[in-house]
Each structure stands twice: as structure tokens, then as C-alpha cells.
Amino acid sequence: MNMGDEIVKKNKYEIDMCNGSIMDKLISFSLPLMLSGILQLMFNAVDIVVVGRFSGSEALAAVGSTTALINVFTNLFIGISLGANVLAARFYAAGKDEEMSETVHTSILLALISGIIMAFLGVIFARICLELMDTPEDVIDLSALYMRIYFLGMPFFMLSNYGAAILRAVGDTKRPLVFLIISGCANALLNLFFVIICHLSVAGVGIGTVISQLISCILVLRCLYQTEGSYQLRFSSLSINMEYLKQIFQVGLPAGIQSTVINFSNVLLQSSVNSFGSIAMAGYTAANNIFGFLYVSVNSVTQACMSFTSQNYGVRKPKRMDRVLVDCMILSFVVSFAMGCGAYFFGPQLLKIYTEDPKVIQCGMEILVYTTVTYFLCGQMDLFPGALRGMGRSGVPMILSIIGTVGLRIVWIFGIFPAHRSLKVLFISYPASWILTIIMQVTCFWFVRRKVHRQLLGETAE
């Protein structure tokens, strides 16, 4: 019997990633995660819709123009949570209860510290960063106000993210979905209350978001606290295990740096959009929200690939790791191509959800033309780094993603775009960067896979 075949008894929320058929379990894992991401974006879209409908285009541009900047601040620490997910999945599959418990408590304390740091940095540097992005004068005050309120909720946001990463590591994506539905509905209702009834505009949306993050945090931590088993949270046991913290950083820090740098390129892109004025900014805000639905759909498959790979790496099943990647490639293509085509053909109708302004809709469609039907490329691009992170290899994929995605976009923004100033030309940089990065990531994966297979097969033989 292979190590880990029957080590861990699964409860009704968990998925056995190491035995049996793969595709149906990938779908069972990915679907709640996909729905969670879509619902989160729908609830975030409520922010945009409410301020756009009831506070005007300036408020809409103010909230939307902060997205890329907020992601630069937060994605470093969210990326580190992937390290917690990989390490926890590996220990859980191998039945190492003590190591699993240490990982949980290290991760939660790390999340709290990270959230406090993020809150401090966001409140202090919000306006300075917005000025560096050339945010127009007519929206910068509202943008800074929204960012400062938003960042006050960072401790809650980080705790719920890291807690959900632990649950995903054991195959539980259903309870985080339920928690999101509860907190998201609260967010939507609070937004309507603060904006329409209290007339707080952008500030009301920010306050509603912070309260909903607190609700999500309480639900996730309560779930971990009441869980019986190796991933039970005991507040008295919160401490940092330096060895496991190092392993979390080895996988998570490169992923976080990659995400942060990529979002920095999006900040440069946002600055380029800002140069077209508030109409283009509003169009980009609406299109970016639609674009986000595509991302969370394929990202759910990437998360599944990483978690499944990590657990099978923990129980030394290299051939099953290969089958996981192939099935993930098929699933990602089907999901991303179908949703991309839908977003393209129904683009005008989807954009009208956010605004009735025909000029804003026209700008939004110029962006969607080149970033929807081709989005399956992005899905395939992310799978290979996801599989490598599941094996504990994160450094080289980070470097290649930065070179392929960020490097090309910077060259595009400062080299090609100034000579051909249009939104269409600006956003062709997306599929171009995806193609370049795929070529590099596949080459890297091939060499690392051979090394990992030899290592695992050698250990199994011993």
C-alpha cells in the first residue's frame, strides 16, 4: 500500500486527493472554489454598481482605480498563504498530525501580523501611491478615502484568507463557500444601507466591506476552532515555528512576489488608462470586473492543481501528479474558453450592469475584445507554476512569470503603446505576455518534473 492511501480518515467536507478517479474530485474541489470566487466578485461588483448608480461616475472611477494598487499591497501576503496551503496539504496527506498543527498555528499568527502591517502601510501611503499613479484630481480624494477605510479591515481579510487556505489544504472548499455567501450578502446589504440611506458614497462602500471582512474572519476562525483533528485551532497554541515559517516562505514568498510584481505591471497599465480620462477609467473598471470572473474561474483549477499535487507529493505518487496536471489542463481550457466566449459575445449587456453611459461601454468593449476569447491562454499559463508550487518549487516559476508577463508588458507600455495610443493596443499586451510565459513555464516544468520523479521514485524504492 502506498504511503497515505488510508492514513487520514476523511470527514464529509474533505476530498481524498490521493486515491480514486481524479477529474470528478477536481470538479468537486474546484466548483465550490469557483463559486466562491464568482460570488466574491459579484459582491465586489455590488460596490461598483451601488456607487456607479447612486453616487455618479466620479465615485465609480474612484473605487475602481484603487483595485490594482490594493492588489499590489495585499497579494504579497496572500501569495504567502499558498505556502501555508502547500505545507499543510503535504503534512495532512502524510498523516503528520503534530506537524500539521504547528503549520496551522504558525499560519494564523502570520496572517494576523501581516494584516496589521498591511493596515498600517495602506492607511499611511494610500494618497502618495495614488499620486504616483497620476490619479486625476477629480477622483483622488475619494480614492484615498476608500483605500484607507478598506485597509483598516486588512487583519480580518488576512485571517480569513489564511484560514481558508488551511481548509483547502484538507480538501474542504464547501464551508468557505458558505461563509462567503453569508459575509457577501451582509456586504451587499450594508453597501445599500450606507450609500443609499446614509448617503456616505465611497466611504459607505468601504465601511460595508470592512464589516463583511470581520464577519468572514469570525466564521472561518470559528470553523477551525470547532474542528476535531490535526488542523484544529487553539488560540493558546498560537506561535511561530521558525522551521515551518521558513518552508511557508520558500513556497509562498516567490508566489507572493510574483503576484505583487504582476500587479505592479497592472498599476502601470492603470496609469496608462488614467491618461485617457475618467470615462476610460470607468470603462476599465467595469471591464476589469468582468475580467475578474474569468480569472477566479481558472484560478480555482490552478488552486486544485496545487493542492492535489502537494498531497500526492506528500505520499510519493509522481504518476498521479502527472494525471492531475493533464486533467487540470483539460478542465481549465473548457472553463476558460466557454466563459471567455460568453464574456465577449455578451460584453455590451454585461457592461450595462455597471453603467448606462455609451462612451464607458465602448471603452469597456475595446478592452474585452483582446482579453476574453484568448483567456484560456492565461489558464494554461498558471497551471504549470501551480503544479511546481505543489512540489515545493516556487522560485524559478516566479522568475519566468515576471520576465514573461511583467517584462513584456513594461516593454509594451513604454515602447509600443506611446507610438500607437489606444486602449486596444494597450491590452493586446495581455495575450502576448501569456503566450511568451507559457513557452518558458512549460520548458521549466519539463526539467523540474524529471528531477522530482527521479527523487520520489528513488525514495519509494528505498
Predicted regions and their residues:
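Short runs within selected transmembrane alpha-helices of multi-pass transporters and secretion channels
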Residues: 81, 150-168, 176-187, 205-220, ...
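Residue-level signal for transmembrane alpha-helical positions in Major Facilitator Superfamily
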Residues: 27, 31, 43, 80, ...
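Residue-level signal for short hydrophobic patches within transmembrane helices
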Residues: 19, 23-42, 46, 69-76, ...
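Transmembrane helical elements of multi-pass membrane transporters/channels
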Residues: 28-47, 149, 160, 183, ...
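Hydrophobic transmembrane alpha-helices of multi-pass small-molecule transporters
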Residues: 72-75, 187-191, 217-221, 293-296, ...
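Helix-terminus/linker motif at the lipid-water interface of multi-pass membrane proteins
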Residues: 42-61, 130-137, 193-200, 260-293, ...
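Short alpha-helical transmembrane segments in multi-pass integral membrane proteins
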Residues: 1-30, 88-153, 197-253, 309-374, ...
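Small-residue-rich hydrophobic transmembrane alpha-helices
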Residues: 60-120, 157-176, 283-341, 345-347, ...
